[in-house]
């Protein structure tokens, strides 16, 4: 539903472009931190446990 509405608003161009940029930048930043933090914890725990 959100995607459909966003695509429909493409006529504006400005709102879609600005919102898309913010979403794209925020999307990679959030998951990257979570993934990195989880990876580091998992690796550290696995290594420490194995060691």
UniProtKB/Swiss-Prot annotation:
Keyword rRNA-binding present in the record's keywords: the answer is no
Name any GO cellular component annotation.
viral nucleocapsid
Q: Name one GO molecular function term.
A: DNA binding
Locate the region Disordered. 1-51
> Known post-translational modifications?
Probably phosphorylated in infected cells.
UniProt entry keywords in alphabetical sequence: DNA-binding, Late protein, Phosphoprotein, Repeat, Viral nucleoprotein, Virion
| Sequence ranges of the sequence repeats | 5-10, 17-22
Compositional bias segments (type: Basic residues): 16-51
Q: List the residue ranges of the region (2 X 6 AA repeats of R-R-R-R-S-S).
A: 5-22
Kindly list the places in or outside the cell where this protein is found, as annotated in its UniProt entry. Answer: Virion
Q: Does the keyword DNA-binding apply?
A: yes
Q: Write out the function statement from the record.
A: Thought to be responsible for DNA condensation during packaging of the nucleocapsids.
Q: What is this protein called?
A: DNA-binding protein
> Which organism is this entry from?
Orgyia pseudotsugata multicapsid polyhedrosis virus (OpMNPV)
Gene that codes for this?
Answer: P6.5
């Amino acid at each position: 539903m959100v995607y459909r509405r966003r695509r429909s608003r493409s006529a504006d161009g400005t709102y879609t472009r600005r919102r898309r940029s913010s979403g794209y930048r925020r999307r990679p930043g959030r998951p990257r931190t979570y993934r990195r933090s989880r990876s580091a914890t998992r690796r550290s725990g696995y290594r420490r446990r194995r060691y």
